[in-house]
From Swiss-Prot:
GO terms for cellular component: plasma membrane-derived thylakoid membrane. The chain crosses the membrane at residues 32-52, 91-111, 178-198. Keywords: Cytochrome c-type biogenesis, Membrane, Thylakoid, Transmembrane, Transmembrane helix. Required during biogenesis of c-type cytochromes (cytochrome c6 and cytochrome f) at the step of heme attachment. This is Cytochrome c biogenesis protein CcsB.
Length: 461
């Protein structure tokens, strides 16, 4: 007598994590409800990043989001900076949401979409009439032939598979099964582009006077891998900045004439920019976003022309005014203040007691404290927002793939089987979408088949 002592072999310990991932984690990761929840959360924080100004100074948030009263009862500058809502698209938790969403889509593609495509490509002939009973749409005809049906289906762009004269399988719209996979690829590409842009892009701001040359230095927000995007071997010169005003004195548009210079100071690009018409060079985009007054050019008596810097004054929200002070005596014991609110050339002159002495325009002179003061020009400065986002081409590519996948998904994957048994013709079909349209198409095919059979019978008789 022999005894069977065989027992189930225990799985090695290193295979346990893989089994756990497949049985417990993977079903959760591929759950449609998780993908929808992640998409809604990402959309919510994306909206917050649009509503809440990004990349501003702490003073800006303290002024616009005070603790008392808090916006919506909870949104203060402290909350914004602690959570990272001032640079939401670069926070670790937002990037983690993108990675998790992309991982969910990728897992869904491999565990559901690709198997569904493989299943759609695997088919078999129906060789028994009872097989047609499980189809949602089927018919039994006492006239017609498989060959006649084959010709009708070919005219309707079906791909025909036929090994015997009495058996047929036809399909069209297999591209509709590929469409969801392409959609997932497009979305994942968009997510990768967004992550790459957040990691390698930067935002800078510069206020540059007319005639000045600058390099991008004032970085206000940058990804951890953005150092390689900072311009090193070229600079930008603001040739001229000016503002067009409406007849009523309001600002119509402001312009900057800009040149890109290489290391030798040679102009390699040139463009006049204004709002919504930026300058782009080597992946860096310069937007016209603001303006200011950087200085005023004056002359006292017959002295050389000199330029005084003008500073933005605190007006408690009553508009923007720039001012400077100019001495009228060598020992600096007396002087006057010059104020300007725009680039139309109007300058207000105040004495030490704050009394308005005179109002002059650019090119005019006036007598103050016994000297002749001539205002030659008010020098403007252009406010530029500078961005670099290497992920944008990837995002655009992803959107192109996404739109292609959406179009492909509109095609219905329709399948038709046919079997000739004696004088009986069995026809059945199914589709994955647009069921009503498919039923109408099958009815038209059967009517066409019946009319051909009737015509053939009349000709024989």
């Amino acid at each position: 007598m022999t005894t069977d002592n065989s027992a189930p072999t225990a799985s090695p310990w290193w295979s346990l994590p893989g089994k756990f991932l497949r049985r417990e984690f993977l079903p959760v990761l591929t759950d449609l409800r998780l993908a929808i929840a992640l998409l809604l959360i990402i959309a919510l924080f994306s909206i917050s990043g649009t509503v809440i100004e990004q990349g501003q100074s702490p003073a800006f948030y303290q002024a616009n989001y005070p603790e008392h009263p808090a916006l919506f009862g909870f949104l203060t500058w402290k909350v914004i900076q602690v959570v990272g809502l001032d640079h939401v698209y670069r926070t670790w938790w937002f990037l983690s949401l993108l990675v998790l969403f992309g991982t969910s889509l990728t897992a869904c593609t491999f565990t559901r979409q690709l198997p569904a495509l493989k299943t759609a490509q695997r088919w078999k002939y129906y060789e028994e009439p009872r097989q047609f009973q499980k189809l949602a749409l089927s018919a039994e005809l006492d006239a017609g032939s498989v060959n006649s049906l084959s010709q009708i289906l070919q005219n309707r762009r079906y791909k025909i598979f036929q090994e015997k004269d009495d058996i047929l399988y036809a399909r069209k719209g297999i591209v509709g099964r590929i469409g969801p996979i392409i959609v997932h690829i497009g979305i994942v590409t968009i997510l990768l582009g967004s992550i790459w842009g957040a990691m390698t892009g930067f935002i800078a701001q510069e206020m540059v006077p007319s005639g000045e040359t600058f390099q991008v230095k004032n970085i206000i927000d940058a990804g951890p891998l953005a150092a390689g995007q900072f311009p090193q071997d070229w600079s930008v010169r603001v040739n001229r900045f000016w503002i067009d005003y409406t007849p009523k004195g309001g600002i119509d548009q402001f312009y900057s004439d800009m040149s890109v210079l290489d290391n030798q100071g040679k102009e390699v690009d040139h463009k006049k920019i204004f709002v919504n018409q930026p300058l782009r060079y080597h992946g860096v985009t310069f937007y016209q976003t603001d303006w200011g007054i950087s200085g005023v050019r004056v002359r006292l008596n017959k002295s050389p022309i000199f330029q005084l810097p003008m500073a933005l004054l605190n007006t408690n929200g009553q508009g923007r005014i720039w001012g400077t002070w100019i001495p009228t005596k060598p020992d600096l014991s007396e002087g006057v203040s010059l104020l300007a609110k725009d680039l139309q050339g109007m300058v207000l002159i105040y004495d030490a007691q704050g009394k308005l002495v005179d109002t002059v325009r650019a090119g005019m002179s006036t007598q103050v404290n016994g000297v002749t003061l001539k205002v030659l020009d008010v020098v403007g400065s252009t406010g530029l927002q500078i961005k670099a986002d290497p992920g944008i081409p990837i995002v655009y590519t992803g959107f192109g793939i996404l739109m292609l996948g959406v179009v492909m998904s509109y095609f219905s994957h329709s399948q038709i089987w046919a079997l000739q048994k004696g004088d009986r013709l069995y026809v059945g079909g199914k589709t994955n979408r647009a069921q009503v349209a498919f039923e109408q198409e099958v009815l038209e095919i059967l009517e066409r088949l019946s009319s051909q059979s009737a015509t053939a019978s009349n000709q024989q008789s």
